[in-house]
Amino acid sequence: SSAASDVYKRQHTDHLYIHFAPNRLDHYRIAFVISKKMEKLAVRRNYIKRTIKEIVNISLKKNLSVDIVFRLKKSYYKSDFKTVKLDITNTLSKIAL
């Protein structure tokens, strides 16, 4: 395992794995792991990234110093936007770094 993955703490929901760790910046950074195996079309992968990014932008304070990585579970594709939004906002409120 890499040094970076050892630093990250993990939370999971029904539809996502969320890895997070503090950073030394005055803002948060977001990354995504959406494999081509799970979603073949780049258009759909980008849509997923945009929607999650928007949920995070609304939910988090801009000056929060944290790196967040979202990994999708297969169940993500069977869920609706409201469920995913609720999952993400609840998990982000638990993180509270």
What would you call each of these model-derived segments?
Residues 5-97:
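Positively charged, solvent-exposed patches that mediate nucleic-acid binding
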